[in-house]
């Protein structure tokens, strides 16, 4: 009788048989056979307490029985918010303002507006995002019959469009009398005093209150009008739909939207008492999620701010951080956070680990915190150290629900700032929020300083970040689809047909890992060539 022993060597299972007859192997239809497990489980990968980064390991391939296009990238951002793609832009003043946040949301992610600016400026940026893709516009700009052509021209300069409903009292809820459009004021630029009552269009196509969005869109499409007013039985204006929004919905079907079909947007605030006024402005402008922006989030200041937000705005989603240990995470979870931001000193422009001797290698931090937070249903955002699609996949494979990107998005046309040339290369500025340049920004009123527990009166500030430049990457609207496509193909290689399935594979032991030596890392990169061009998309 044949006897077989199984020996695990360097993470591989090797079978030895006392008989020379070849062993008959059966193929698993799922690709998962406990007796043929190679590599290490996630728990085994970190069991020695080593500080690992994303480049220190690989994920072993799995079984493919689906196409890459079938991979579902939906993933929770917080307890109540789900993204169509697990991608978040960092709240940095050289990464995310309204233009970046709009692009992120259109592609299924979300942008977090930075707070290194005045509260009014930040609230306006949030407002721009919420107004970009309206769906049902519940608070459209409205004119009255006594408004003039000059008022419409001024509104066009401010808002960027010319079509406005006209009601009896010039307010939403007033009886709808007509519409004024660009065709009504054409050639009247020199007649700013003309009343809208004399030029507005009164024959309108409307839809009844309570109509669903697909039906309303069908009416709008058939009418060939630019806007569709929604009225109640008394003929009073209650909402609007715009044709431009219908076009946007077709171009970006996976956009991240709220219940009103408006784009999702987040904003960062500090933990100082004056940030409560900033928070009120952001909430008034429709912000969907708040990130408490701190390099070390395990503080009495953040705990108190979390409790204040939950008491004052119980429905508002709050993400706490940054944290890198389970003990840090516990205090914020106990305070009531809806999500956690993980990372300390791992960003490309961050020097916290070097200067403060404090932090944690990012892969280890993501695994430890996400494993703990999972028990309480709190999603984790991996923040820092993301340099490629592979790093995004690895962060999620360690338990993160989403990744936050800074340098990966800096240099795109949607990032704040102007391009400049150096030695013929088109560049854009990128700086850490802990850099002296960011902390000394004139209009910020100390917002970036508060992230590192400095204030404007400090005589000496210790920099925890640097300033640099990034090569032009083009538009985020081209770059994000590349990242998402790569993420789908990577999940296919691993054998996970969704982001949620990938995370499940961590905890049932189906996902297998392999540590990489320095030589293995060199082997896995381009080598042996005299010269090469690395084009990613």
Curated annotation (Swiss-Prot):
GO molecular function: IMP dehydrogenase activity; metal ion binding; nucleotide binding
Gene Ontology CC terms: cytoplasm
Residue ranges occupied by any CBS domain in the UniProt entry: 136-195, 200-256
Residue numbers binding K(+): 345, 347, 350, 523-524
Activity regulation text: Mycophenolic acid (MPA) is a non-competitive inhibitor that prevents formation of the closed enzyme conformation by binding to the same site as the amobile flap. In contrast, mizoribine monophosphate (MZP) is a competitive inhibitor that induces the closed conformation. MPA is a potent inhibitor of mammalian IMPDHs but a poor inhibitor of the bacterial enzymes. MZP is a more potent inhibitor of bacterial IMPDH.
Keyword Oxidoreductase listed: yes
SMART domains: CBS, IMPDH
Keywords tagged on the record: CBS domain, Cytoplasm, GMP biosynthesis, Metal-binding, NAD, Oxidoreductase, Phosphoprotein, Potassium, Purine biosynthesis, Repeat
Binding site for IMP: 348, 383-385, 406-407, 430-434, 464
Active site: 350 (thioimidate intermediate)
UniProt pathway: Purine metabolism; XMP biosynthesis via de novo pathway; XMP from IMP: step 1/1
Pfam families with a match to the protein in the record: CBS (PF00571), IMPDH (PF00478)
UniProt tissue specificity: Enriched in adult ovary and testis.
Coiled coil regions in record: none
Entry binding sites for NAD(+): 293-295, 343-345
Residues with PTM Phosphoserine: 28
Main location: cytoplasm
Job description of the protein: Catalyzes the conversion of inosine 5'-phosphate (IMP) to xanthosine 5'-phosphate (XMP), the first committed and rate-limiting step in the de novo synthesis of guanine nucleotides, and therefore plays an important role in the regulation of cell growth.
Family, as annotated: Belongs to the IMPDH/GMPR family.
Designated name of the protein: Inosine-5'-monophosphate dehydrogenase
Organism of origin: Drosophila melanogaster
